[in-house]
Amino acid sequence: MPGFFQKLWDLITAPPVWRFKSDHQVRCKIMLQESSINDLKRLRSLFLKKNRYANRLFILEGYLLIKEAMISGYPLENIFFTQQSIDANHGKELLSLCNNLNVAVKSIDPKVLHQISDTKNNQGILAICKMRDEAEVFDKRILVLYEISDPGNMGTLLRTAAWFGIRTVIISEKSADPYNPKVVRSAMGAHFLLEIKTN
């Protein structure tokens, strides 16, 4: 594998331009460019519930959550890395996992990420994730969450539902938003296994 990582490193350190290589294991487009002002505005906007649902997008923060999303095939739109996170092993691993995915990879200034991030000690990695379309309920086992207002409790319940093999969760109107960044972190990847219906 050393040759593969050397090629990946060459891509990372190359000038900001679209690259496409067919002779190595990462066969996706890797867009190495700085985040635009519009990117940053969009990131900030997705920390508000109304904007998440208007765009059907939500935020993932941290290496493990983003890795879990990629492994499970959950649709990602953009991944933002600080230079330090790109240089780290987990950053290179995430780049290698983008095999066969058309995900835009952009750099972001760590100070800007710190201002945007919902966590005090972020890992320098943030992604925009697409919400699944809400399908009709077919699963016989359904969890209904009624007026669960605490984001941590909501995330724990989603995680528990996924662990017990429940695939459909219906969430009442006055409950915490299941796509709130705190809920997403607390759920620890449960979103990628569940059909979540709101309101």
Model segments located where?
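Aromatic (phenylalanine/tyrosine) cluster motif
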Residues: F4-F5, F20
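Intrinsic-disorder-associated, low-complexity terminal segments enriched in Asp/Asn/His/Tyr and depleted
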Residues: D10, D23-H24
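Boundary-proximal intrinsically disordered activation/regulatory segments immediately upstream
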Residues: I30-S85
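Glycine/small-residue-rich loop that forms an oxyanion/phosphate-binding "nest" at active or ligand-binding sites
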Residues: V105-K120
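Short acidic-hydrophobic, aromatic-tinged amphipathic segments that line or gate anion-handling sites
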Residues: L32, K106-D109, E195-N199
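RNA substrate-binding interface of SAM-dependent RNA methyltransferases
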Residues: I71, I128, D133-N199
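Short, aromatic/basic amphipathic alpha-helical patches
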Residues: N89-N100
